[in-house]
């Protein structure tokens, strides 16, 4: 397994941006096993962090590096700042995630070009980014994982709190994310709910969707509402609830469930940089 820290120049963001990449490339077969074909590209998960996070969050909070190696899965973890993974006046974070990042990593690493091998996931703000960009760029992504997601925009964004200790709750930041007309944002492609309705009306092919939320999570009702919308629009999906709140213990457990839900096979055992003999 190779763990890479990468910086590259992004045209969408207008600056150099960091990301962390897991590549299960150096695994040596055990005696009697056949090596993985060198020309076989890797299935890929683009994994997005939550608010105030960075491209190292998933490595620190979960066992993703071991689970990825066990499944011969490449994992790309970009730094999304506090952008909601939406295009804003200064940086096109949505296009960066949905187009530029995928194009760059496919050119740079041995990743599959196929939609059915390309997945996007995230937690909290990253879950929102995965839903929004997975749906907007549905021709690129074959599956979406949304854990404890800010699943949809609703009237809550019209009532910011200027006294909140969280900058993302303030009016200026919300207008930066969603535009000056917050009511219009509710009916735009910034809202995953609108994208669901639009794609359903068009008869488009939806990515497979996996959602999970803790039963004590403050975002539980938003997740239930989005689940109900998917049911109303007859969109196949998996929605799971379990004990826990907005915390890494829950995300670690349900990330494994999500990986088991993806069309991945457990790879043959081998020796790599993560093994100690």
Predicted regions mapped to residue ranges:
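Non-catalytic cap/lid and distal C-terminal segments of serine-dependent acyl enzymes
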Residues: 1-277
């Amino acid at each position: 397994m190779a763990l890479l820290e990468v910086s590259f120049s992004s045209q969408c963001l207008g600056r150099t941006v960091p990301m962390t990449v897991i590549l299960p490339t150096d695994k040596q077969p055990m005696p009697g096993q056949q090596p993985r074909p060198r020309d076989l590209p890797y299935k890929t998960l683009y994994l997005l962090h939550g608010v105030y996070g960075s491209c190292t969050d998933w490595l620190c909070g979960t066992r993703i590096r071991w689970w990825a190696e066990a499944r011969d899965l490449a994992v790309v973890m970009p730094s999304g700042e506090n952008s909601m993974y939406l295009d804003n006046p200064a940086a096109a974070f949505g296009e960066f995630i949905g187009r530029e990042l995928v194009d760059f990593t496919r050119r740079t690493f041995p990743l599959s070009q196929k939609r059915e091998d390309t997945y996007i996931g995230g937690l909290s703000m990253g879950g929102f980014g995965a839903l929004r960009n997975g749906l907007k760029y549905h021709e690129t992504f074959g599956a979406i994982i949304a854990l404890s997601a800010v699943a949809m925009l609703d009237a809550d964004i019209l009532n910011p709190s200027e006294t909140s200790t969280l900058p993302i709750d303030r009016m200026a930041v919300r207008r930066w994310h969603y535009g000056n007309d917050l009511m219009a944002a509710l009916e735009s492609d910034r809202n995953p709910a609108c994208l669901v309705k639009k794609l359903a009306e068009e008869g488009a092919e939806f990515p497979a969707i996996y959602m999970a939320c803790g039963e004590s999570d403050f975002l539980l009702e938003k997740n239930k509402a989005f689940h109900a919308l998917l049911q109303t629009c007859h969109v196949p999906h998996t929605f799971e609830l379990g004990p826990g709140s907005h915390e890494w213990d829950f995300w670690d457990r349900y990330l494994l469930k999500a990986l088991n839900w993806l069309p991945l096979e457990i790879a043959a055992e081998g020796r790599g940089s993560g093994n100690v003999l």
